[in-house]
A protein has these predicted regions:
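Serine-esterase "nucleophile elbow" of acetyl-processing enzymes
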Residues: 121-187, 307, 313
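Short strand-turn-strand beta-turns centered on an Asx-Gly dipeptide
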Residues: 17-22, 73-75
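Activation corresponds to long, low-complexity, non-globular regions
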Residues: 77-120
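Exposed low-complexity, polar/acidic, P/S/T/G-rich flexible segments that act as propeptides
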Residues: 54-85
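Alpha-helical cap/lid subdomain in secreted, periplasmic
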Residues: 182-324
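Short beta-strand/loop motifs in extracellular/secreted proteins, especially
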Residues: 10-14, 42-44, 67-69
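Extracellular carbohydrate recognition and processing domains
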Residues: 21-39, 87-92
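A short beta-strand element within beta-rich, extracytoplasmic domains
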Residues: 1-8, 45-51, 55-60
Length: 324
């Protein structure tokens, strides 16, 4: 938590709790960062009680404000300006009221409660893919952009690499892709492994009736029980960094293990995802250039997925980097 006060001669007192554990109780008169480590939980809850805005301070017209400048989980922003709520209470001259945001100008309590989107990275081995798992020079993992939806096999980017197998699965999430790739390197050999990853908002969910499946926002699917609540959270708190922060650490651990078995390369066709990978996975494995989908070239027949020329250009771009 990064805090920035603006105060006069009488600074405020703050009492801060993270998931009901008190982490700070004292006066704040200069910028302060508070770091707290805790076991993974399903939600991140922060409460900040602010006092000290006495009638004398109000009458002096001196400022006594605190800005919750940033809240980070695993190094990624949780957007306190969008999801914070301040309940101002016990103030001279003004009524109690609630405001949204990350500013505390009066006495009161600031609260912040967001879901933590953890992922289990379960391998999904029963999905439709172009090739059967086997030893190969280059193993390619991804979603429909790798599988080549609405394209023939020889129009996909893995085909253009040569000596490569296409293990892309339409509609896959990052966690399904990474989980399956992790399983693959435990059971097969490859000289290098390439992942083309989708948006971070695709999450692998579990249902006792459906098993493991991927939620893709705005497709209009119907959900029940726990999955319904998870989907509601994804829609309400859909900031990429907030979504990714819940599973980035576990993903990094799995990528390290994959990279110990083979040369690992990752990239994305989604700008948000590519930005998250660049911020969190540099040094863990090699990050390939962004997959561009230029309007200059014809799309697949559904006019949503990339066409053969997009794939050929991407393969030509990364082939010298992959070597072999």
């Amino acid at each position: 938590i990064n805090l920035k006060p603006t105060t006069g001669s009488m600074p405020p007192r703050l009492r801060i709790a993270i998931n009901e554990t008190e982490v700070f109780d004292g006066v704040i008169d200069q910028p302060k960062s508070i770091r707290h480590e805790t076991e993974s939980q399903d939600r991140l809850n922060i409460t900040i009680h602010k006092t000290g805005k006495t009638k004398d301070v109000v009458d002096s017209k001196e400022p006594q404000e605190v800005l919750v400048d940033e809240v980070l989980l695993n190094g990624l922003s949780q957007h306190p300006d969008k999801f914070g709520v301040f309940n101002q209470t016990n103030n001279s001259y003004v009524k109690d009221q609630t405001t949204e945001g990350n500013e505390m100008a009066l006495n009161g309590s600031w609260s912040f409660d967001v879901p933590v989107f953890r992922q289990e990275f379960v391998p999904e081995l029963d999905r439709t893919q172009r090739d059967q798992f086997t030893d190969i020079g280059t193993a390619c993992f991804g979603c429909s952009f790798t599988y080549g939806t609405f394209l023939d096999d020889n129009q996909t980017w893995p085909y253009h690499l040569g000596d490569a197998k296409n293990y892309g699965v339409g509609g896959n999430s990052i966690s399904a892709i990474v989980g399956t790739a992790h399983w693959y390197v435990q059971n097969f050999k490859c000289d290098r492994l390439v992942m083309l990853l989708p948006h971070v908002c695709r999450l692998q969910l579990h249902d006792q009736h459906k098993g493991s499946w991927t939620f893709i926002p705005f497709l209009g699917d119907k959900f029940e029980g726990e999955a319904k609540e998870k989907v509601k959270d994804i829609v309400m708190f859909g900031e990429p960094s907030l979504l990714f922060s819940g599973y980035a650490t576990r993903m990094k651990e799995l990528l390290v293990e994959i990279n110990e078995k083979t040369d690992l390369y990752i990239t994305s066709y989604q700008p948000d995802t590519y930005d998250m990978l660049d911020k969190t996975m540099n040094g863990v494995c090699k990050i390939l250039p962004f997959y561009e989908m230029s309007a200059e070239f014809e799309m697949a027949s559904d006019n949503e997925h990339p066409g053969t020329e997009h794939n050929r250009i991407f393969a030509n771009q990364i082939r010298p980097i992959l070597g072999g």
